[in-house]
Amino acid sequence: MTLGEMCSVQRGKRLTKRDLNHNGRYPVFHGGIEPIGYYSSSNREANSVMVINVGASAGTVGYSSKEFWSSDGCFCFSHCEQLNQKYLFYALQSMENSIKGQVRKAGIPTLDNKVVEKLKIPIPSLAEQQRIVSILDKFEALTTSISEGLPKEIELRRKQYEYYRNQLLSFAQPLPKT
């Protein structure tokens, strides 16, 4: 079954720089998986998948656990009963290189919505989708933990090494002869 048969692929709505504000509640995504600013309302519900469709990041797959504003630089997908959005995220992420390979590179890189609609996504039962998501979420947490925790552990070991080195090399000063 293709992605376009399962759910509708929706392009976000354009905002101008004047529309963005620092006090806005909802992040705005356009041409990248990092927000370009904030806006006072959202047009996508929490736990939604996005695929960047324009610019250097075209074809990149993203996921937001919070409501957000999807600009016209992103494709998003309607939520449907037979498809767990986090499962869709992981499935599309596994196809990301293939998706990026179909980006038109002339001028400004662009991904056509037909490419995304024609993607074939295996759809197991919702229970199986949830099981897969649970496993992949654990791996994601472990990877994040390693990339954040390992530098901290290295720093602590370096300090421990310096402490013991200094202890070993701080010989007691001989008492002056009287």
What are these regions (language model features)?
Residues 1-178:
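Charged, alpha-helix-forming regions
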